[in-house]
Curated annotation (Swiss-Prot):
Upper lineage: Eukaryota, Viridiplantae, Streptophyta, Embryophyta, Tracheophyta
Propeptide: 1-2
Keyword Magnesium in record: yes
Family listed: Belongs to the RuBisCO large chain family. Type I subfamily.
Protein name: Ribulose bisphosphate carboxylase large chain
Organism: Lepidium virginicum
Pfam families xrefs: RuBisCO_large, RuBisCO_large_N
Note on how the cofactor is bound: Binds 1 Mg(2+) ion per subunit.
Catalytic-site annotation from UniProt: 175 (proton acceptor), 294 (proton acceptor)
PROSITE patterns: RUBISCO_LARGE
Length: 478
């Protein structure tokens, strides 16, 4: 044995590999109010015990690595390590388990969603001992939440800016999403806004392409906003997509939007990235701009039930990073969305305090303390016949977006907007009168058709449209 080896042995360092569960599985651990808690759906490889799999997740997403290292002795693992403190089987799934992991707050940089995700989900999802892994939920403690600005303005400030109360807001995505010139695009915006919508929207992939450069689009949309406001007496907006290839270019576009005096800009927060999104949210708060968030790419991450990350986690991350609106599915339209699960993360977006409720997929009680709420946006394959259900499901604090359901009207954009506004006002009035939208919804819409030919035409066009496909990402036990 060499002198160096003898020296290392004499200080008690023992090289080699040991089971993760010996260090990182701690069922006796009592979680702290300052811990970030995570619920992982773990599918171990055959032969790997769930305790070892859960401990491996805790280790590889905090202080651990595959072998013992001598530098472990230079820090306090007991202070900094993640701990798998509970494991439970998933009902109806023999090979899946929910592993609960607690992370000490000191592992994370203040005010950084980027760092939080890099730690918790950055590396462990490719671990060979796991056949699949999904992050189902996070508990963000108030001590960490308070390090974030969150949404630039929040629900109440937005309503005050727009002077609109007592009903959902109405929007429309301009179609076709790609190919229009800036002038024709602005014309479509104007027709929709003058017809009664509160907002129109750039689609997620409208940035600055050869057929329509961003500056031209911003100018023509601003003209449409001001003209429709003058005609209707209502405050209007268009979500000008500031998403760009660099953060500097993104902020430049937001600056130009502010100079035009428009009320709101937009960002694709997953493809753009959390660092860019947080920077834009800070700019929007400092400069009085509302911020609409599109979740493009989310289904790549959240759609499969056994691997990836549930959208409720992405929704919480957005509330931390900052956004005044975010797309949240429809339940009734063309996009994936279980009703109870959707209502669960809608609560997490809007409410100040949300209790644990496994029937809605909420694994932890979440206290947002003073962080403003986010308006959920229902968008994707919806039309006037969906209005009663959308009003009943999402309530007043929401934005209902009818893209094809506005521009697909046989008489044009403005009549399509009129049809949606009339249907919404009829549903809100009926609800306020005590009528049950879930039971009487179709009858309420038919009654409104008697005094709105635009709505009658829309109802005729879309009376047979259905999107009857089973939900893939169902809650456990369904």
């Amino acid at each position: 044995m060499s002198p160096q080896t003898e020296t290392k042995a004499s200080v008690g360092f023992k090289a080699g590999v040991k089971e993760y569960k010996l260090t990182y599985y701690t069922p006796e651990y009592e979680t702290k109010d300052t811990d970030i808690l995570a619920a992982f759906r773990v599918t171990p490889q055959p032969g790997v015990p769930p305790e070892e799999a859960g401990a491996a997740v805790a280790a590889e997403s905090s202080t651990g690595t595959w072998t013992t290292v001598w530098t472990d002795g230079l820090t306090s693992l007991d202070r900094y390590k993640g701990r798998c403190y509970h494991i439970e089987p998933v009902p109806g799934e023999e090979t899946q388990f929910i592993a609960y992991v607690a992370y000490p707050l000191d592992l994370f940089e203040e005010g950084s969603v980027t760092n939080m995700f890099t730690s918790i989900v950055g590396n462990v999802f490719g671990f060979k001992a796991l056949a699949a892994l999904r992050l189902e939920d996070l508990r963000i403690p108030p001590a960490y939440t308070k390090t974030f600005q969150g949404p630039p303005h929040g629900i109440q400030v937005e309503r005050d800016k727009l002077n609109k109360y007592g009903r959902p807001l109405l929007g429309c995505t301009i179609k076709p999403k790609l190919g229009l010139s800036a002038k024709n695009y602005g014309r479509a915006v104007y027709e929709c806004l003058r017809g009664g919508l509160d907002f129109t929207k750039d689609d997620e992939n409208v940035n600055s392409q050869p057929f329509m450069r961003w500056r031209d689009r911003f100018l023509f949309c601003a003209e449409a906003i001001y003209k429709s406001q003058a005609e209707t007496g209502e405050i209007k907006g268009h979500y000008l997509n500031a998403t760009a290839g660099t953060c500097e270019e993104m902020i430049k576009r937001a600056v130009f939007a502010r100079e035009l005096g428009v009320p709101i800009v937009m960002h694709d927060y997953l493809t753009g990235g959390f660092t860019a999104n947080t920077s834009l949210a800070h700019y929007c708060r400092d400069n009085g701009l509302l911020l609409h968030i599109h979740r493009a790419m989310h289904a790549v991450i959240d759609r499969q039930k056994n691997h990836g990350m549930h959208f409720r986690v992405l929704a919480k991350a957005l509330r931390l990073s900052g956004g005044d609106h975010i797309h949240a599915g429809t339940v009734v339209g063309k996009l994936e969305g279980d009703r109870e699960s959707t209502l669960g993360f809608v609560d997490l977006l809007r409410d100040d305090y949300v209790e644990k409720d496994r029937s809605r997929g909420i694994f932890f009680t979440q206290d947002w303390v003073s962080l403003p709420g986010v308006l959920p946006v229902a968008s994707g394959g919806i039309h006037v016949w969906h209005m009663p259900a959308l009003t009943e499901i999402f309530g007043d604090d929401s934005v209902l977006h009818f893209g094809g359901g506005t521009l697909g009207h046989p008489w044009g954009n403005a009549p399509g907007a009129v049809a949606n506004r009339v249907a919404l006002e009829a549903c809100v009035q009926a609800r306020n009168e005590g009528r049950d939208l879930a039971v009487e919804g179709n009858e309420i819409v038919r009654e409104a058709c008697k005094w709105s030919p635009e709505l009658a035409a829309a109802c005729e066009v879309w009376k047979e449209i259905r999107f009857n496909f089973p939900t893939i990402d169902k809650l456990d036990g369904q």
